[in-house]
Amino acid sequence: MKSYIFVHQGVSDEIEFALALLGYIVIRLPSFGALGPYVCCHPDSLLFPLPDGRLLMHENYYRENRELFDRTGLRFALTDEPVGAEYPQDVLLNALALRDVLYGRLDSVSKTVKAAYNKHVGVKQGYARCSVLALGERAAVTADRGLEKALLSQGASVLMLPPGGIILRAAAPSGFDEKGKKIKPVGDAVRCDGFIGGSGVMLGEDTCGFFGDITAYKHYEQLQSFARSHGVRLVSLGTGPLEDMGGAVIAGLK
């Protein structure tokens, strides 16, 4: 079985090599000009894994990168719903699915995503998937009080951590925006308010990999204790500070 992992185009060679050693075929996602610089390369803003195995993306993004996606042999679903660079127009696909429950800013989430789930829980946080590090189907980590409350209401075990300490880096979008205008490049701006969910990804049922050195994260001990209690081990995919890279999306071919 081929297992593809879709990641931010800016992941280091070190991280790509670590994922390849685990058996994944690594696909670096190009930027999408319709989105803003901080999320234009983020998998959790570009792809949504539907329950039927298809990956949902905006039709314009697919058109721009058709050859890249088609050569995987995976199945895709497309949407032409409005998307933009400003919040909350950029959260179309940034919803969280956990135990068959969909969490998100429901007035901004794709209709296709909502139609795939019978149970919806609305939250104020538009970047729901990026804000939550899911450790399997029953445990989650977040810094967002609204999401904590929503997850607890559905029986999930939740670790609440303070925000901060996670890098968020702007990328230079390429191509054209939703109005057909050429995207102006931006500088390599860096912030330290990234989300915990965007800094890691579950690699199988019992391992969570992180973009950076998870042991250097200031809340590592607390996170490790919580993860261990749920049978999950934490591994660093790279060195350097923890970075919000929009998580990753894994899809396989049998």
Question: What residue ranges belong to the model's regions?
Answer:
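Histidine/cysteine-enriched polar flanking segments
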Residues: 1-254
